[in-house]
């Protein structure tokens, strides 16, 4: 506090000493002031930090989030590319389908509502109305075209199941989205839309309040992958998953090529998330997927699959079979079959092959892990110590895995005597032997502590290489392998491509190789390897190696895709021949071709059952023991019967390979009897279709005497016909009957028929079937021949020009196989 004071010069105030309380108040004020300033600074710092965090650190993120709240980003699905065979036939395509869904919560006609005291709403279903709507929707869903409602069988299980699905879905009154059906075609979708529109219009004006209201049913566009031929080349084509992504086969290996690139449409949206009608939209167009054009030919594939299926059934093949037709010069695959397989339209369904698969899994339980285990994970055994199978296991995963596998590239096997072609090529190319090099076969041959025998323990005596290959002498090839030596043997084995993948453009080619390196090839290993019983390979590896032995020595990369095109058919990429290396010389290859032709020998050699009259065919059979599998009940090893053929033998164009894994033919295990006829059958149809060069001999006008085939097994019957230049057609109700003997044939035994006539064989009847004769007058001879062949008839053409007369009246009924004489002029 201040008080005034006086002095002589100035008038002023004198400071009075402050009290203690005053000094405390002053310090508090100063502290508060400082704290206030500090608080302002801290607050400012927080604000600045927050702004920095929002605008700088997370600025892009928040701006994107804000944009997302204002913009609607819609995906435009790219259409998946198609897959065509070599001639342009569609093997896989994509179609637009629809998912039909409903919003029961907004379908006021289906329920009555009551507001409760607590403001909640209780909805009560109207069963009669729900049943009426469900019935109408189900009829349209099952009609196929949305119009043929009367054709739907309402008593069928299919109808009852679909009806219940729709009814149950519509009954979920608090749900805003329920699926009624998927993969619905456009006609059905339009029919449902028409019904819903008409229904809502009628019930909007209803005077009866119980009939007033609406139903909310909508559709969503989606895509469906279609495979028009079903279980055809399934292991090659593969399939896509529910999202349209390739998961197996070509669909997987060419996923990025087929899929294309999705597009986008970006536009403003309103408060409820819908697009604003007048707002500007930015569209990034989708880029549809490219198409695959295969080297695979549907006709060649069908022939290979048909004869492979017959052989599997006829010989009770336990572990599936496979077949390959390949261009030996380019590696282009014309057919690749693994049977039994699956339908890529429904790959999860294995019921058609369930009995076969069940027997297979139980025959080799360790391969599929189906033994019972105790609480500690140990296998449970019976009193004899045998592992007990889990009969209640869910084998579905195993079953699908078996059927989905492409046997030609995923499974290893011992090639057996087919590999003798490779050993022979090694000997000739290395210079340690020639075709005239001889070794003696005494029926037994000792190597270290092992004793080797030939099939049937035969003693072949003194043989040159060609005779040894023809008689499939194990002992000759063991001695040849010894002369080649371990290091050189391995070098050739590697050069022929057996130590690496083939590089085929398919997924899942096994990376597991089972072979001996040079330093591991002891005396016994080398001996066993020389005739194909020590190193395991894939069927496709065997094919590419055989191709190299006959095409001049070049190892080519096999391929299934020939070219890639855009949606307009323009070629984007061509897949040409890829020669990896030359393995043997041209001269060595020529010798191999000669010896392989000697093996088939115009129907007289060891591979005679693959001979087809009119063609120069080389080949080699192989019957191998599967040393890595369980033995049969009789104690013998399970067998693999295989045969490889090349033609024309003097300058091969194609290779035909057949393999039957664990055939159970009570008569024989020999591949020359089991597999060679299958190759011959395939050749009999494929060679003329592809225009393969014949042996040059003109057989037109040649008359052939039909052999007596009644009582002969189908496999033997077709061999006889192929050798004589007669075609064959099996007429039966069940393909499994092909194991039975022929019960009837037409034309009959002893008939004189033109070369190339088709003989119709039956295994389930003692009389032939009949067919109606078409009218071919006025047609060209070639077209008339096609018409008669399609009707199951043979023909003889006399004269030239168009057909003027035919020996059987048009419309008449004759026995299938009858020869119709056509008079031309």
PLM regions: where:
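Periplasmic/cell-envelope proteins involved in peptidoglycan metabolism and beta-lactam response
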Residues: 1-390, 412, 487-494, 611-613, ...
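Beta-lactam-recognizing serine transpeptidase/beta-lactamase-like catalytic domain environment
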Residues: 6, 92, 98, 270-284, ...
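Extracytoplasmic
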Residues: 76-79, 86, 93-97, 175, ...
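Soluble non-cytosolic domains of exported or imported proteins
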Residues: 78, 124-131, 182-186, 244-248, ...
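Sec-exported extracytoplasmic/periplasmic mature domains
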Residues: 138-146, 197, 241, 259, ...
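Acidic/histidine-enriched alpha-helical segments
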Residues: 149-165, 317-330, 440-444, 507-510, ...
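Ligand-recognition elements built from short beta-strands and adjacent flexible loops
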Residues: 575, 614, 628, 658-825
């Amino acid at each position: 506090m201040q008080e005034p004071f006086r002095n002589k010069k100035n008038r002023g105030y004198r400071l009075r000493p402050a009290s203690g309380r005053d000094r405390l108040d002053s310090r508090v004020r100063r502290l508060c002031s400082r704290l206030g300033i500090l608080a302002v600074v801290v607050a400012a710092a927080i604000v600045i930090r927050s702004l920095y965090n929002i605008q700088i650190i997370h600025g892009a993120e928040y701006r994107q989030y804000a944009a997302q709240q204002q913009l609607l980003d819609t995906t435009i699905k790219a259409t998946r590319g198609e897959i065509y065979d070599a001639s342009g036939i569609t093997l896989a395509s994509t179609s637009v389908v629809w998912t039909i869904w409903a919003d029961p919560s907004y379908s006021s006609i289906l329920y009555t509502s009551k507001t409760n005291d607590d403001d909640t709403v209780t909805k009560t279903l109207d069963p009669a109305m729900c049943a009426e709507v469900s019935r109408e929707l189900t009829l349209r869903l099952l009609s196929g075209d949305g119009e043929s409602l009367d054709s739907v069988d309402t008593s069928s299980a299919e109808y009852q199941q679909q009806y219940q699905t729709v009814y149950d879905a519509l009954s979920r009154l608090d749900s805003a989205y329920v699926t009624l059906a998927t993969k619905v075609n456009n006609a059905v979708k339009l029919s449902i839309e028409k019904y819903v529109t008409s229904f809502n219009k009628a019930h909007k004006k209803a005077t009866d309040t119980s009939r007033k209201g609406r139903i909310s049913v909508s559709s969503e566009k989606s895509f469906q992958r279609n495979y028009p031929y079903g279980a055809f080349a399934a292991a090659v084509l593969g399939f896509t998953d529910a999202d349209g992504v390739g998961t197996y086969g070509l669909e997987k290996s060419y996923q990025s090529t087929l899929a294309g690139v999705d597009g986008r449409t970006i536009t403003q949206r309103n408060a409820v998330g819908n697009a604003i009608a007048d707002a500007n939209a930015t569209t990034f167009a989708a880029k549809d997927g490219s198409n695959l054009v295969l080297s695979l030919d549907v006709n060649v594939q069908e022939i290979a699959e048909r004869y492979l299926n017959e052989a599997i059934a006829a010989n009770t093949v336990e572990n599936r079979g496979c077949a390959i037709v390949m261009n030996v010069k380019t590696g282009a695959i014309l057919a690749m079959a693994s049977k039994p397989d699956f339908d890529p339209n429904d790959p999860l369904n294995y019921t058609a092959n369930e009995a076969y698969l069940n027997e297979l899994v139980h025959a080799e339980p360790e391969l599929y892990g189906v033994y019972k285990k105790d609480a500690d994970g140990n296998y449970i055994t019976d009193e004899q110590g045998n592992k007990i199978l889990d009969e209640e296991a869910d084998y579905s995963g195993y079953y699908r895995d078996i059927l989905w596998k492409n046997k030609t590239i995923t499974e290893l096997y011992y090639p057996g005597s087919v590999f003798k072609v490779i050993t022979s090529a090694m000997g000739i190319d290395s210079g340690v032997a020639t075709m005239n090099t001889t070794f003696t076969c005494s029926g037994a041959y000792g190597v270290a502590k092992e004793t080797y025998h030939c099939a049937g323990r035969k003693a072949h005596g003194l043989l040159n290489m060609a005779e040894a290959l023809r008689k499939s002498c194990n002992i000759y090839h063991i001695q040849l392998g010894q002369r080649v030596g371990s290091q050189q043997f391995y070098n050739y084995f590697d050069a022929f491509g057996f130590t690496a993948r083939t590089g085929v453009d398919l997924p899942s080619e096994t990376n597991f190789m089972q072979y001996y390196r040079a330093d591991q090839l002891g005396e016994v290993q080398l001996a066993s390897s020389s005739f194909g019983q020590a190193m395991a390979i894939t069927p496709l590896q065997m094919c590419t190696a055989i191709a190299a032995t006959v095409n001049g020595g070049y190892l080519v990369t096999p391929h299934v895709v020939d070219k890639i095109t855009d949606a307009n058919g323009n070629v984007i990429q061509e897949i040409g021949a890829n020669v990896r290396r030359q393995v043997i010389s041209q001269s060595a290859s020529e010798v191999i071709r000669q010896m392989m032709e000697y093996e088939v020998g115009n129907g007289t050699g060891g591979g005679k059952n693959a001979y087809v009259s009119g063609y120069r065919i080389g080949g080699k059979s192989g019957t191998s023991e599967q040393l890595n599998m369980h033995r049969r009940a009789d104690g013998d090893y399970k067998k693999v019967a295989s045969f490889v053929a090349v033609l024309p033998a003097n300058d091969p164009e194609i290779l035909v390979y057949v393999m039957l894994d664990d055939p159970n033919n009570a008569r024989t295990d020999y591949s020359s009897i089991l597999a060679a006829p299958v190759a011959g059958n395939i050749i009999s149809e494929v060679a003329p279709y592809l225009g393969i060069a014949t042996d040059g001999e003109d057989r037109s006008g040649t008359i052939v005497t039909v052999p007596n085939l009644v009582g002969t097994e189908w496999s033997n019957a077709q061999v006889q016909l192929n050798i004589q230049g007669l075609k064959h057609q099996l007429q039966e109700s069940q393909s499994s009957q092909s194991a039975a003997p022929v019960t009837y044939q037409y034309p009959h035994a002893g008939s004189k028929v033109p070369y190339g006539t088709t003989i119709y064989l039956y295994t389930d009847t003692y009389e032939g079937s009949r067919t109606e004769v078409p009218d071919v007058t006025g047609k060209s001879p070639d077209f008339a021949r096609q018409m008669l062949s399609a009707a199951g008839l043979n023909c003889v053409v006399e004269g030239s020009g168009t057909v003027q007369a035919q020996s059987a009246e048009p419309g008449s009924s004759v026995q299938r196989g009858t020869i119709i004489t056509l008079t031309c002029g």
